């Protein structure tokens, strides 16, 4: 990997939806909550004209009688254009009313718009019918669970107080709540059995906590309670505290992938002091609440005292906690807690709030207190204190500790040294989900569907995905031995693979060919292209340029850009991608209270692609760089694209990276906010929620929010189309299921509506072409 400059500015990926080591807490949160996320995925939810157009015509009369066509268009009222504008806003009913009056035999475009509106209504009715059916199904299941709880049959194995049964009922309540109307939801939550189950979950969580099983309390109880009632602050706060405690426990223990000593190696107390100095001069807010930072850090230290007596065995006589984690004796814990209480009082007594130096003084006092009481590893305590203090600022200001730097760099560049596979863990088995083309794994004969039983002799059964990744990747030219079991074969076998440089492509199509190449033309008759952008790396813009030129060479008429689940990447990449579709004006500006405008990115006319219709698909996981691209192209200044989907994540900020001068650590800190071309600032979710509002991020023009069932179906089909297998694999095998474009669109309401918007755009372009006297307007044969 080439040497990086000391300071870089970028829009990073959102650590909530991707695996990236932005902090010890984030990494452990991923490890701790992966099972919970998998469990909840199914229940909680919520993707101009061609440069070289082909000789395709709307109708014979349009091409042979251009004068008559122009006269007809000039006489036509603005009904078509107005109806199109209503459709772009998601106002299909209003558009339907508008086009009822004019004579569709005179204005054929109105007839095609009516067909599009009818298709939209069909999609909406089908979705509503599915929601109602799903709600009824959950009510039946809930009644069944209630009946099982009342049974007097001594042979009945159901125990309503058993955690598994509580989870099963909570999952039914969660799904019923998702599909219910507001009136149905109120009725559901007033049900005695539902109330009883929720109380049992709260009681069960308390029991788990008494036994030091904080993760169990979260996964089995509070994760479900939060899903059932996401607006309940008590559930959210208590769930967060449970996770904090669970993270502390795991962070102080050895794991199959690293020892505690390895985890905290290289961490110095000077790193915290350095970080505070950097933030005092460069953080996005002029006034930093150092008191709040101190309170959060001391709170974390208090949680340490709560966790250690239950989570660790008593410390042997004369042994220091520096060598291995253990529970301090009662006197040590009492002294630690008393010292923290005194420090807390000092913080509260400050009438004007703490200054920077006073926060550092609190840090020094906590370290001294630890030395006199707990004797916990200083590097571990520095990490705990620092992470908690920085969390008081925003979710994106974090320390990247020495152990995490390599993983962090990989997440930013999409480059690493490994073997080139995507892995998952269905049914607890570490499995190759897909291959990357022309990589060591592909060349060695590894295939999608292979179960990885062991890595270098270490069994993977109890290994987390993060741990498995760390064991499989490694320095270039080194070897890793994977013990695999292929579906349909009884015996395992070893495959030795030499690691190499892997560059993960950030563009995908809607499907693959038999040879593994991506297909980007999702609608051949209408020449509609589809490009899914999974991240914004230094190579994304050049990859996109190649794809667009190829599509335009095939007569591209319209483009769908899918930014769903794209959590971000490089700011420069987002600017370069946006610039491909804009001739002039501003793309984005970033502003800091210290330096004013840090970035002003104008569009350039050179190399701008044709002004064909565009739709951008967005969702709740579209963040950071994705929000910049979507916001710039849909901004009223440009009106280059229509946004379809649901509201984006709401990151709204730009981070900088600076390196600790005496070690490998890095500080990633929020340094600016970004503004759209119209100068509107993209609001962050955190600050917007504090104001009781919900207008964070970028809102869609046409809102289509997927249910959990729809999301699962869409992702299942997408994964099936994405899988790359070895050449020669039977394409009709049960383990390899490809789907047609029609099936892919039908399984994805956001994409389906996006296609309708695109076809509406094509009708509008057709009308404009006729008005301009073009004899070869945009094709609309299959609209």
Stretches with model-predicted labels:
Residues 4, 8-13, 18, 28, ...:
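C-terminal "post-core" interaction segments
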Residues 84-87, 146, 161, 209:
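Hydrophobic/aromatic side-chain positions at a characteristic register within alpha-helices
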Residues 99-123, 174-196, 225-243:
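Short, charge-rich amphipathic alpha-helical segments embedded
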Residues 144, 149, 203-207, 261, ...:
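PDZ/PDZ-like domain segments forming the peptide/carboxylate-binding groove
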Residues 188-202, 207-346:
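Cationic-aromatic interfacial patches
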Residues 379, 384-386, 393-434:
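PDZ/PDZ-like peptide-tail recognition elements
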Residues 428-431, 453, 467-512, 670-671:
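PDZ-domain C-terminal substructure recognizer with occasional recognition of PDZ-binding tails
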Residues 446-484, 545-549, 573, 651-657:
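PDZ domains, with a preference for the canonical peptide-binding region formed by the helix
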